[in-house]
Amino acid sequence: MRKYFGTDGIRGIAGESLTADLSFKVGKALGKLLTEKKEHPKVIIGRDTRISCDMIEQALTAGLTSTGVNVMTVGTIPTPAIAYLTKTIETDSGIMISASHNPYQDNGIKIFGSDGFKLTDDQELEIEYLIDNTDKIKNASFEKIGKLYSGNELTQKYVQHIKQSISGDLSGIKIALDCANGATTGVAPFIFGDLEADIETIGCKPNGININDNVGSTKIDTIANFVKENNVDVGFAFDGDGDRVLAVDSKGNIVDGDKIMFILAKHLKEQGELKDNMVVSTVMSNIGFYKAIEENGLQSVKTAVGDRYVVEEMRNNDYSLGGEQSGHIILMNYATTGDGILTAVKLTNIIKTSGKSLEELAGEVSIYPQKLVNIKVIDKKSAMEDAEILVECEKVEKELEGNGRILLRASGTENLIRVMVEASSDELTDKYCEQVAKIVREKFEVK
């Protein structure tokens, strides 16, 4: 049973469950592992715009340097940039301080290996053990204490990497960017501007407490309304740490991760760059996505929910494209993790080179009506194993008869049960979703 790590690193309310003390212990635990392999290993640390990032960064740095690790801080930067820099400047580990799409009160610690990929389960468990035994970790002797460096200039390496992912520019396309008052604020507008796109921005004035506050990919209506009101060709909304993105077309229609994956897959297939014509998705992808994939001579494989599972499947089989409906899109030829800016640049380039609007490109996917209900529960494990709930799910699945589906899953980061139904009409999704959700609420909901 994990004590600290969830499906996407360590997360908690800053100052409560995620304290300076815990952050120091995480740094010391990671430092212990790294210094066992070499003297003065290097760790790069990035952050989003939350007010608590200072506290966590300084505590992590103290823990790392106390064991002899040299630390380079790069300031506010997207998560995929940390993953990219960790690999390309040959550091021994990378850390991103962020709680992604969560409100500013939360924060988190994501750790990457020297290859730019997130840690394995075994590595995380090893760190957990050391966190609880930091009193047994020796401090470095005075002459071997680690040093702290500033690496703010390294952001430019990531900027160049993204710009070089396409040939040509993005001139002639009017784009709106919603940076969620988060980690993409100082980078995304700069990249699109350099690529000669005509850009408008919102959510680019972080103040420490407004990250994801009515902006970003979890508040997609904000960018949708902006696009409609300002005669924009395409809008992109990033999440707080920039590892995912959702799009909207010129009419304000949402283009989610499923549609983005389909557009990218079709393009990559035409370019001969899609390994085995395969797209890796999760069980949350819409039935309409799978039908469009099949109709266009593409293949797909499903994983559990979570970008780490998508990446694992891609690495095991050397696949080049994968992602989630929520907007985590992994282009493995360019990145080791989901990258919202890279995805947005690639999608805009397809719009320009194809001569088609985003409406036309996304219109090939007919999305089935979908309803998702989140229920805060007392015990998500018991809810997932409850016989009455499971029987009701089987009953719904049978009634849908292959023309829809029901999915019951527990959140990996919160004490939530998610009930998702897809069917041929909104009436059916509402009916079946409520049918199951009612039982979950009656038996397990937090009152």
Predicted regions: what is each one?
Residues 1-62, 66-67, 145-175, 381, ...:
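An N-terminal, well-structured beta->alpha segment
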Residues 13, 107-228:
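Gly/Ser/Thr-enriched, mixed-charge loops and adjacent short helices
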Residues 32, 39-107, 190-248:
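N-terminal small/polar loop signature for handling phosphorylated ligands or for N-terminal nucleophile
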Residues 40-48, 72, 174-176, 278-283, ...:
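Short glycine-rich phosphate-binding loop at a beta-alpha junction
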Residues 92-106, 227-249, 253-254, 298-339:
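Glycine-rich phosphate-binding loop
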Residues 125-159, 164, 250-323, 330:
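Proline/glycine-rich low-complexity loops and linkers
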Residues 271-447:
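Phosphate-binding and adjacent anionic-ligand microenvironments
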